[in-house]
Amino acid sequence: MAYFSSRLPIALLLIGISGFVCKQYVTVFYGIPAWRNATVPLICATTNRDTWGTVQCLPDNGDYTEIRLNITEAFDAWDNTVTQQAVDDVWRLFETSIKPCVKLTPLCVAMNCSKTETNPGNASSTTTTKPTTTSRGLKTINETDPCIKNDSCTGLGEEEIMQCNFSMTGLRRDELKQYKDTWYSEDLECNNTRKYTSRCYIRTCNTTIIQESCDKHYWDSLRFRYCAPPGFFLLRCNDTNYSGFMPNCSKVVASSCTRMMETQSSTWFGFNGTRAENRTYIYWHEKDNRTIISLNTYYNLSIHCKRPGNKTVVPIRTVSGLLFHSQPINKRPRQAWCWFKGNWTEAIKEVKRTIIKHPRYKGGAKNITSVKLVSEHGKGSDPETTYMWTNCRGEFLYCNMTWFLNWVENKTNTTRRNYAPCHIRQIINTWHKVGKNIYLPPREGELSCNSTVTSLIANINSDNSTTNISVSAEVSELYRLELGDYKLVEITPIGFAPTDVRRYSSVKPRNKRGVMVLGFLGFLAMAGSAMGATSLTLSAQSRTLLAGIVQQQQQPVDVVKRQQELLRLTVWGTKNLQARVTAIEKYLKDQAQLNSWGCAFRQVCHTTVPWPNETLTPNWNNMTWQQWEKQVHFLDANITALLEEAQIQQEKNMYELQKINSWDVFGNWFDLTSWIKYIHLGLYIVAGLVVLRIVVYIVQMLARLRKGYRPVFSSPPSYTQQIPIRKDRGQPANEETEEGGGNDGDYRSWPWQIEYIHFLLRQLRNLLIWLYNGCRTLLLKTFQILHQISTNLQPLRLPVAYLQYGISWFQEALRAAARATGETLASAGETLWEALRRAARAIIAIPRRIRQGLELTLL
């Protein structure tokens, strides 16, 4: 027990020393390759040179590279700011292109309408349109079929148009006027009141404010890409198994811009996509059945739509300031239609096989026949879901896909065609928000458009026996496929980590490592490296970061200068201009934050703040900065507050230290501010002496009271008994003075002021003597101690010298022995090697000697 008691203080001492030595402090690193998810606006870039493209986007220079990163990152195509911005921006471009602007609420009146046919003499006659009968069976066409040119393929009819009459107030508000207008039958809701005429209204005119386009605009496809603003960058999952959601994508690349993509706006299918490959793959939502299927490019799938016939558009002025457009009927227009080219049946079979192999749908799909492509729509469904909706040269086509579905599903006893009849509507449901727009009647002349089919929008419902691929009207899903493998992140170059180095302590200098001058993405090349290796290059990385940010923001600045006039009045132009200052604002914000911690313009900044969580320590050899930041992000607020408090205290200490340092300059003693301080000091000394006098007086009065003695008739302050002074012998008694003052008595005393001065001098003398004796005693004791230590160390000098000499001699002997041993081993090795070589040569020569002996014998 005594043994442990004697060792306990030593153990406690060692624990205390180890705790002091191993204490961790917060170290601030600037320029680390770390990031966090961001939601800032992206910049649009395009190669289109038409007015629409140049007004909406910046010119694309095509100089964008990708860098492979050795990291793991999570990606989600549906929870993604890049895809959401694409949907919003394309809708904005869509509205800008076709822009409905005239309210048509006044046209919500009853109209008398009739289905109309015309003869060549323009004498219209009202008849009932007979439905077109279509024979059942298979009928496919190809590019050489003459019906394509003549628009006379089997089953295609004429567009149903209704001529309507209605009354409205014209320029005279109190007087009704008769108007005539022509509508597509699909845009009207009618009640059959007579045999040939109907009472009709515009569809949904009572539920929505409808607008008409001011002018007919083109909706041509626009190829564009997104670019990250300065200080941000894009990550892309480059894994071929990525299907819209992957929490751990290990094949990640970084870039400043996305790939080029097309502006798409259609239901059922995606056109001219950039993600199509020589395989079929599925993007699926993590929580529901929303999917988008990328179709195989091997089958060369395409769609060719056409609207035949000539049409004219004339204005109708209804009331003052309101102009509505109509089309006079010259001839019943032929029906618009779309032709599907390519090996569609095999493409759909491959889609089914892909679904069967997919791990999410294995439970329902047993074979290809159990997977069906269907169009599920109930009563009252939007026409964009019931029909395939697309935009062809500014016209909105609604195609009945029944023949097409029968063809690809190979349904017997049905009408199977590789083309679909379409009709054109003027009242359109908006695909991005709830609402309706009305557009001008179809443009004059023949319209046609061709597109490559690259994807299928669907909802996949699976049960125990079948799996249904239900086509969908979610236009936004197209951009999940195009940009779902990207994510926008913001660089966070400031990081915290614990080290055992405290501020202002001696630190071994770091070995400098040569770093190549890289661009902005080169800064991210170290993202997959260990923290220890990255910290060695922070100085160069921080310079690369700033230079890359400046270079990155210079690109939009240059292109903005080229198009300053066009960009002045556009929304996207304003967004692009705002992105210019993002980088500098971010850099200044980081430097201001570093300055508040006392780490301005430092790449590695040691502090005096203890590390708040000793259980969290980084693995400098195997952990990346991004992994470390994810572990300690919850400590950022606490560390930031501690660093700010430490910096405030440090500034106070530095201020006090500077005040002390100013005393050693002799000229500062004669400064005006110094004299003011001296005056203050003098006033304090006088006040102190007064207080000291009062205290001494009180103390002495108390002391005399304790002795029971006090001068009776002494004038205060009288500290001693009055000194008796005898009368002069030569002075006459009772001699009156010149003034008749009489005798002044036999005794008198010195004035009390002189006695007080004597007392004060005695006190001061005693104080100085005490200070002198104390200092002299302290110096003598110190000298005696030092002399004693020196005397005690004197005998040790000779043994220490002998010991040093012995150590040096021993080292020299070891070196000599090592040299001798090396030489001996080398000589022995050479001798052994030579002996082995000779023995080997002798063994090898045995067959030759035998042969030579035999030859001699035979000779």
Curated annotation (Swiss-Prot):
Residues 577-593 are annotated as: Immunosuppression. Residues 24-678 are extracellular. A lipid is attached at C775 (S-palmitoyl cysteine). InterPro entries: Gp120_core_sf, GP41-like, HIV1_Gp120. Residues 1-23 form the signal peptide. Residues 715-744 are annotated as: Disordered. Pfam families: GP120, GP41. The record marks R513, G514 as: Cleavage. Residues 113-163 are annotated as: V1. Disulfide bonds join C44-C57, C101-C214, C108-C205, C113-C164, C227-C257, C237-C249, C305-C338, C392-C449, C399-C422. A motif (Di-leucine internalization motif) lies at residues 858-859. Residues 626-647 form a coiled coil. Residues 399-422 are annotated as: V4. Residues 514-534 are annotated as: Fusion peptide. Keywords: AIDS, Apoptosis, Clathrin-mediated endocytosis of virus by host, Cleavage on pair of basic residues, Coiled coil, Disulfide bond, Fusion of virus membrane with host endosomal membrane, Fusion of virus membrane with host membrane, Glycoprotein, Host cell membrane, Host endosome, Host membrane, Host-virus interaction, Inhibition of host innate immune response by virus, Inhibition of host tetherin by virus, Lipoprotein, Membrane, Palmitate, Signal, Transmembrane, Transmembrane helix, Viral attachment to host cell, Viral envelope protein, Viral immunoevasion, Viral penetration into host cytoplasm, Virion, Virus endocytosis by host, Virus entry into host cell. One of its GO terms (biological process) is symbiont-mediated-mediated suppression of host tetherin activity. GO terms for molecular function: structural molecule activity. Specific enzymatic cleavages in vivo yield mature proteins. Envelope glycoproteins are synthesized as an inactive precursor that is heavily N-glycosylated and processed likely by host cell furin in the Golgi to yield the mature SU and TM proteins. The cleavage site between SU and TM requires the minimal sequence [KR]-X-[KR]-R. Palmitoylation of the transmembrane protein and of Env polyprotein (prior to its proteolytic cleavage) is essential for their association with host cell membrane lipid rafts. Palmitoylation is therefore required for envelope trafficking to classical lipid rafts, but not for viral replication. Residues 659-680 are annotated as: MPER. One of its GO terms (cellular component) is membrane. A motif (YXXV motif) lies at residues 709-712. Some HIV-2 isolates have been described that can infect cells independently of CD4, using CXCR4 as primary receptor. These isolates may have an exposed coreceptor binding site. The surface protein gp120 (SU) attaches the virus to the host lymphoid cell by binding to the primary receptor CD4. This interaction induces a structural rearrangement creating a high affinity binding site for a chemokine coreceptor like CXCR4 and/or CCR5. This peculiar 2 stage receptor-interaction strategy allows gp120 to maintain the highly conserved coreceptor-binding site in a cryptic conformation, protected from neutralizing antibodies. Since CD4 also displays a binding site for the disulfide-isomerase P4HB/PDI, a P4HB/PDI-CD4-CXCR4-gp120 complex may form. Some of the most genetically diverse regions of the viral genome are present in Env. They are called variable regions 1 through 5 (V1 through V5). Coreceptor usage of gp120 is determined mainly by the primary structure of the third variable region (V3) in the outer domain of gp120. Binding to CCR5 involves a region adjacent in addition to V3. This is Envelope glycoprotein gp160. It comes from Human immunodeficiency virus type 2 subtype B (isolate D205). The gene is env.
